[in-house]
A protein has these predicted regions:
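Conserved N-terminal alpha-helical segment that immediately precedes and caps sugar-phosphate-binding
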Residues: 1-94
Length: 94
């Protein structure tokens, strides 16, 4: 089996395992928050440090590309004045 095939099989298994851990109510709640962002023109503020920060930037860019106002907020910078971009109606993904 090639390395690519092994990698794809491992990724597929991880996705299948995640699907069994998610409850419909959790998915519905997350989708409701995203709907709220779209309906109220609220921002989706995504944060993370290190590897999770890299993923957070990608998630923010992906949501922005489909028309949802989303941004990456460095949590260290947030502590030093950047929280001004966050409004009460915004949704945070930590």
């Amino acid at each position: 089996m090639s390395a690519l095939t092994r990698c794809l099989n491992e990724e597929a298994a991880a996705i299948a395992a995640a699907a069994t851990r998610l409850e419909a109510s959790q998915v519905d709640a997350a989708l409701d928050l995203l709907d709220r962002c779209a309906d109220q023109r609220a921002k989706l503020v995504i944060t993370g440090v290190g590897k999770s920060g890299i993923v957070a930037r990608k998630i923010a860019a992906t949501f922005s590309s489909i028309g949802l106002m989303a941004l990456y907020l460095n949590p260290l910078d947030a502590l030093h004045g950047d929280l001004g971009v966050v409004a009460p109606e915004d949704v945070a993904l930590l």
